[in-house]
Amino acid sequence: MFTGSIVALVTPMDENGNVCRTSLKKLIDYHVANGTSAIVSVGTTGESATLSHEEHGDVVMMTLELADGRIPVIAGTGANATAEAISLTKRFNDSGVVGCLTVTPYYNRPTQEGLFQHFKAIAEHTDLPQILYNVPSRTGCDMLPETVGRLAEIKNIVGIKEATGNLSRVHQIKELVSDDFILLSGDDATGMDFMQLGGVGVISVTANVAAREMADMCRLALAGQFAEARAINQRLMPLHTKLFVEPNPIPVKWGCKALGLVATDTLRLPMTPITDHGREAVTAALKHAGLL
């Protein structure tokens, strides 16, 4: 369940900014039908930063309900206060989620020892598998391989979503962890190469609009069929980059709307609607991928 194409799912909203259950079901059905391995609910792409604590939990529970056992659900449970991350994680202890994805604390920029103590404390309050999430471009905090190696010794810390885009991290981390520690790319543009170097999948933004293509690319890469996987990846490369032409999830939410997967591309402030330039860039990338 922690391999292949795992979608970092958008959180669809209606025109008033409320979570849209109808569109959420449509998205989940789309991923079930197109081979996505698992769903991450309420991660960065799911707008965790602009959902209240209560809404955050409610969206994960709604996702579980609508998935109805058809696809594994991973809960995003990150926060920059350790107590809040623990509280979020504990809410899902007996919920049915298969694990938690927990981002490094953002803005307050802890030391490496602070990161170790943060994730250790969370793991001590749950039996759920914990996937670390390192994305310094969003958090201002880079969890170094040595810290990952220390955390990997904790029983229920089972893997990491590495989103630096720095492929040398694969080798650096692999040298410090056991063979069964899960390495997932969090950067679509380098995900293919990440798997060729020993990663086992991608937690993907692109999969929101190209579920089948990402699932096929990951399946082929993990089977060692890299030429075939790379052919798909080349078709998707403009999407991998243009979905970040404006801050995530602005472009991908608009892409979901353009494909009819959600009713609106509504976001909550301070995220604002996609610009004309962004719309043109995403449209061109969707066409290049054969999706429009």
From Swiss-Prot:
Protein name (Swiss-Prot/TrEMBL): 4-hydroxy-tetrahydrodipicolinate synthase
Gene: dapA
Family, per entry: Belongs to the DapA family.
Recorded catalytic activity of this chain's protein: L-aspartate 4-semialdehyde + pyruvate = (2S,4S)-4-hydroxy-2,3,4,5-tetrahydrodipicolinate + H2O + H(+)
NCBIfam families per record: dapA
Any Gene Ontology CC annotation: cytosol
InterPro entries reported for this sequence: Aldolase_TIM, DapA, DapA-like, Schiff_base-form_aldolases_AS, Schiff_base-form_aldolases_CS
Site (Part of a proton relay during catalysis) residue list: T44, Y107
EC number(s) from the headed UniProt entry: 4.3.3.7
Residue positions of the active site: Y133 (proton donor/acceptor), K161 (schiff-base intermediate with substrate)
Keyword field contains Lyase: yes
Location of the protein in the cell: Cytoplasm
Any Pfam family: DHDPS
